[in-house]
Amino acid sequence: AKGEALDIRQGVPFCTPCSVYAGSYEDAKDSDIVIITSGIARKPGQTRLDLAQTNVNIIKSITPNITKYAPDAIYLFVSNPVDILTYTFCKCSGIPESRILGSGTILDTARLRARLSEYYQINQQNVHAYVLGEHGDSSFVPWSVANISNIPANAYQKAMENTDGMLIPPLNYADVEDYMRKSGGNVIRRKGATFYAVSISV
């Protein structure tokens, strides 16, 4: 933690001023927001659910320590499996559910939008599509509400037609969802862990 804090702190001169340091539970005293990232990381070939029991035990062990100093904070969970850990904290912390959040499928949504923007070669900010459900293999995309530049996703391909036919081959929804679900594992296989996209999403 000290090494991470030092690395980030040395980049603060390029950002909005803030204090970054490795601390203790007591340093969270009277915090407005507490972000929980505790837990072991996925290894290549593991699913998020493979981490469940170990990370549930970790959350149960840290909960009394953190809630002691920040009983009025809003808690945001990022650790995997995020849905299970968020639920665990709800049950064992005594904190009102209205102040407990999980990152849910926000990262899955970002990965979906990134893939669609790559496919259609457009700015990601013009892609409006969402992933619902569990942050994991059972997540799904409600394509009926997806749109690209205010054009429904299922009509966007037709909008790209020209006299020579389609500019880009028709999108395979199943392939896109498969890409989205496997993105985390693909990053882990290549570099060992995911850091940047999930950090930005929070």
Q: Can you annotate each of these PLM segments?
A:
Residues 2-30, 46:
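Conserved N-terminal Rossmann-fold NAD(P) cofactor-binding segment
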Residues 26-28, 81-84, 134-136:
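Short, internal active-site loops enriched in acidic
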Residues 32-35:
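N-terminal Rossmann-like NAD(P) cofactor-binding module of classical short-chain dehydrogenase/reductase
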Residues 38-40:
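Conserved NAD(P)H cofactor-binding loop of Rossmann-fold oxidoreductase domains
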Residues 42-44:
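N-terminal glycine-rich phosphate/adenylate-binding segment common to multiple enzyme folds
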Residues 47-114:
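Rossmann-like NAD(P)(H) cofactor-binding subdomain of soluble oxidoreductases
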Residues 93-99, 108-202:
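C-terminal substrate-binding/catalytic lobe of Rossmann-fold NAD(P)-dependent dehydrogenases
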